[in-house]
C-alpha cells in the first residue's frame, strides 16, 4: 500500500526561520536509564523527556539523564514519586527520596515540572474495581455529591501541599484521559494537565475540556501524552500509521505543548506484542516521531490556546469524568450512583464534530458549516469559571448534572445581561445532593430572574410532539411550518413541573395533531427570556438531557445554537477536516483523510474568502 505521509505547508514567508515554541519528545522508562534520552537526542526526536517508572529512579540514574539533557539542550519532567492512592511516597522511594529531590532542585533550570496524581480520573472515578490496585479505589463510600466533591478537593490539595513540603519542583503535572477530571485537578492545586490521549469518540471532548479548564483557571498551556501506541489499535498497518501521524498534528492544531510519545521510543510493550529497540516497527515509530519533531522545529505556532465561541458548562457536583466510568463519583459498589441520562448527555459534545447529512432538513443558512463548531472547536468549562473568562464565550450550554447555588445563578444572570446566550433545562436548576433525592428546585422554583418562569409543585409528563412557533432573538433558526404541520419529536415524554410564566417568550408548544387553526397554549415547551443584551433559551424539562425522551430535541437545539453563532473566520469543509483559530488570526487546517484530498473555503469576513486545497493528511497554517 502506498505510504501517505503527513504533509505540512506554512503560508507565511520566513516563519520557518523562527525557533519553535512547542516541545516534542518521548517517555523515558527507568529501566533504560539515559538510553531513551540519548536516542531522542541522536535521532532528532525532539528535546523533551518525561521520566517514567519501570522500577525506581535513583540519584545516579537521574544524573545520567540530566547529563544527556544538558549536553543536548533538552528538558525533562520527573516521574511520580508519591503514591496515587495513599498519602506519602511510594515504598520504593522511601530511602532515596531526599537525595532525589536534592538532584532535582539543583537542576530545576532544565526541569519542566513533576508528575503528581497520574490517572486521577481513572483511579478515583472511572476504573472498574478489578483495575485498581488490590481491588480497591481511592474514593471512599459516600452518600452525597458534596461529600465526594469535598473528598476530591482535599485529596488533590493534600497531595500537592505534601509535594510542596518535600520541595518537589513545580509545576505539578497530572496525566490522564478522563475529560471531566481536569477541572477537579486544576481547581485544587495541580498546575498543568497533560492529556493521555486515548483514541476514540472522546478525543475532541478531551481537548475541549482541557482547553476550557486551563483557560478558566489561568493556566497557559496543557500537554499531550500521545498514547496512540496503546489505544490506537493493535494492528500496525498503513491505516494505523496514518492515525499515528494524524494524532501528532492534531495535538499541535489543538494547542498542546509539550507533545510526547507515551511509548515506542525505545520499545513497544502493548497488548500481545513485545518489541525491542531495533525492531522495524519500533524504528518506524521513531521515524514518525522524528518527522513530526523536525516539522515542529521549523514551524512555530501562535502563542496561547485556540479560540472558542461556544462552551459547555460542567456543572456543580457533576461527578462524571468519562472513559470507562460506570458510577458517579467513583461509587462503584453503590448502584444508586450508577450513571444515567445526565452523564450520557455529554455525547452531544462529540456530535458537534459530526457533519449533518446532505439529506438533513435541519441545516440552514447560505453555507454548510456543520461538522465543525464555530472557530473549529468548543470548550468544556467549569462552573466556577471567573466571570471575565465566561464573557469570552458567545453561547454557554448546560448538558450534565448541575446543582445550582446562589453564586452560579448570579453569575449566569450577569453573563446574559452583558450579551451572552444560555441554553439550559429545568434539570439544571436542581439542588439535589444525592441520587436518592428527587428533583429539588433551586430557590423554591422561583427562576423568574434567569428564565422568566416560576416552577410550581405539580409535575406532569409532556404528552405530545413539538411545534416551533417562533425563532429566538439570538439568531437561531427553527423549523416553522405554521400550525398545520406534523409535530416533531413525537417520541418525547419528558417530565416537567407546572409553572407560571412571568415574561418569557414561547418558542415551541406541544402538539398531537397535524391540522390546527392555532397553536395550543396548553403545553409550552421552549422559551426565550431576554435579560439586558442577551437571552436564555429554556426547556422546562426536569428529565436529564441524555434521557431518550429529551436527547433528540436538545441535540437539535444545540445544533441550531452552533449554526446561529456568527463569528469569523468560518471554514466550509467536511468533518474530515479539523481546524483551529488563534487570537492572532492564524487558522490551522488538518485533513484527517487517509487517501482523499479536500478543498475547503476559508471565509475571513462576509466579503472575503479563499479556497484552500489540502492533500491527504496535510496540515496547513494560514496567517
PLM regions and their residue ranges:
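Mature N-terminal, pre-catalytic/accessory segment of carbohydrate-active enzymes
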Residues: 15-82, 95-120, 131-143, 306-307, ...
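Substrate-binding cleft/loops of secretory-pathway carbohydrate-active enzymes
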Residues: 103-104, 161-209, 231-239, 439, ...
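Active-site clefts of carbohydrate-active enzymes
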Residues: 190, 209-241, 265-278
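Carbohydrate-binding surface patches
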Residues: 305-341, 391, 402, 413, ...
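A glycine-rich, often tryptophan-bearing local segment used as a flexible ligand/cofactor-contacting loop or short
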Residues: 402-492
